[in-house]
Amino acid sequence: MADDLVDGLTRAGLPGAKATARYVHTSPTKARRVVDLVRGRSASEALDILRFAPQAASTDVYKVVASAVANAENNHNLDPATLWIGAAYVDEGPTLKRIRPRAQGRAYRIRKRTSHITVVVESREPVSTGAGARTTRRAR
């Protein structure tokens, strides 16, 4: 997924920006669980969700989303209010192997996993909830 952003444009042809955190000391499985919460949402809503998410990986994902928003604002002059999470994924980084002493002289191998977190934000028009929005529920 290295071609997510080319010349400031996403795959969909929308202007955007990208941020990556590499070698984060979080398991990719746990980080993916947090990234799935915010994929496809507006950037401000994603930051609010991550701020109050109970998972430990949410702080790392929060920093990457905030960095992507700052990159879009400073490098491409995009309005932060129109930014959405276009692509967000977690790749597996190198695994650090450690030894844990166990009973009777044995030793277990401990795998400390790392991950690379990537977030691409794109600028879209804000969705309006005007008169065309349906607010009543259908009777059963």
UniProtKB/Swiss-Prot annotation:
Protein name: Large ribosomal subunit protein uL22
An example Gene Ontology biological process: translation
InterPro entries xrefs: Ribosomal_uL22 (IPR001063), Ribosomal_uL22_bac/chlpt-type (IPR005727), Ribosomal_uL22_bac/org-type (IPR047867), Ribosomal_uL22_CS (IPR018260), Ribosomal_uL22_sf (IPR036394)
PANTHER family: CHLOROPLAST 50S RIBOSOMAL PROTEIN L22-RELATED (PTHR13501), LARGE RIBOSOMAL SUBUNIT PROTEIN UL22M (PTHR13501:SF8)
Family the UniProt entry places it in: Belongs to the universal ribosomal protein uL22 family.
Family matches, as Gene3D superfamilies: Ribosomal protein L22/L17 (3.90.470.10)
Keywords in alphabetical order: Ribonucleoprotein, Ribosomal protein, RNA-binding, rRNA-binding
UniProt-listed SUPFAM superfamilies: Ribosomal protein L22
PROSITE patterns: RIBOSOMAL_L22 (PS00464)
